[in-house]
Structure formats: structure tokens, C-alpha cells
Design a protein with these regions (language model features):
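Register position in tetratricopeptide repeats
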Residues: 2-5, 36, 69, 103, ...
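TPR/TPR-like (Sel1-like) alpha-helical repeat modules
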Residues: 83-85, 91, 95-125
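Conserved structural position within tetratricopeptide repeats
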Residues: 17-18, 48-52, 81-85, 119
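Alpha-solenoid helical repeat scaffolds
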Residues: 25-29, 58-62, 92-96, 112, ...
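Short coil turns that delineate tetratricopeptide repeat
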Residues: 21, 54-55, 88, 122
Length: 143
């Protein structure tokens, strides 16, 4: 229910907080549901509470996305970098950093990150990696 947030789902999570509020999986899914509903502050609070119990790649990406939506770019980048350190073979954190640099108009850093993405070896081929590399190539061609 976290990935299809409705008011009922969010209300169910809220009702379960007193019982499951120390379960990191519950907290993560609750934070995702709140984020999906656009409740950035509540989502951030729950995600940070989750982080006290759990160090997780997906949680760092979620925190980065929340901070990005709050226009707190330094915090967003920090969480994307933590996700990248946790799973160095993954492309998504690098792409999120690249997209952040483009969003704030830092062409120099965006280009450096683009080169890193394009030169990064692929451990396991996927559609996501194909999309990321194709998008970065297109962006560089449009420069």
C-alpha cells in the first residue's frame, strides 16, 4: 500500500504507528506513502526516524528525493552520495546527482557526472541503465 498511497492507506499507517513505530520496514513504507501523497515534512520526519534503526540504500534515495523536492539541494546530494557509497555498482544515485546538477544549473558538475556515468562499467545489464546512459548521451548532444 506504500506505493499506491491513498488517504485511507496513510490513515492506516498513522493508526499503526503506536504499534509498529519502531519497525524500520513499517517506517520506510509509511515514509514512502507520505511522500507519494506530497506530505514532505511528515515523510521526512518518518524517514529520519526510520534511519535511526536502519541504514539502507533505498532509504537514502528517498531522503534525497524528499530534500530535492524541498529545494534543499546540498542535503539531497549528500543522501544520493550515501546511497552511491552503499551500492557503488548502481547507476541510479549517480543519475540523481547528475539530474540535481542540471536542475540547479551547474553545468560543469553535471558534465563531470555525465562522464562518470557513461564510463562506469555495467555489472548487470538492465533497462534502467540503458535509459540512464541514453538520457545522459542525449543531454550531452543537446549541449
Amino acid at each position: 500500500i506504500a506505493y499506491f498511497p491513498t488517504n485511507e492507506n496513510v490513515r492506516a499507517y498513522k493508526d499503526l504507528m503506536p504499534i509498529l513505530g519502531d519497525d524500520p520496514y513499517f517506517l520506510y513504507n509509511y515514509a514512502v506513502a507520505l511522500y507519494g501523497k506530497g506530505c514532505l515534512e511528515e515523510s521526512l520526519n518518518v524517514a529520519l526516524q526510520c534511519r535511526t534503526y536502519w541504514a539502507d540504500y533505498d532509504l537514502e534515495l528517498l531522503l534525497g528525493d524528499i530534500y530535492l523536492d524541498k529545494n534543499e539541494h546540498i542535503e539531497a546530494e549528500s543522501h544520493y552520495r550515501k546511497a552511491s557509497f552503499m551500492c557503488p555498482s548502481r547507476f541510479t544515485p549517480l543519475y540523481k546527482i547528475y539530474s540535481l546538477y542540471r536542475r540547479i544549473g551547474d553545468g560543469k558538475e553535471a558534465t563531470a557526472m555525465a562522464q562518470l556515468i557513461l564510463e562506469k562499467p555495467i555489472k548487470i545489464q538492465s533497462n534502467t541503465i540503458d535509459f540512464i546512459k541514453a538520457q545522459v548521451r542525449r543531454d550531452l548532444e543537446l549541449k
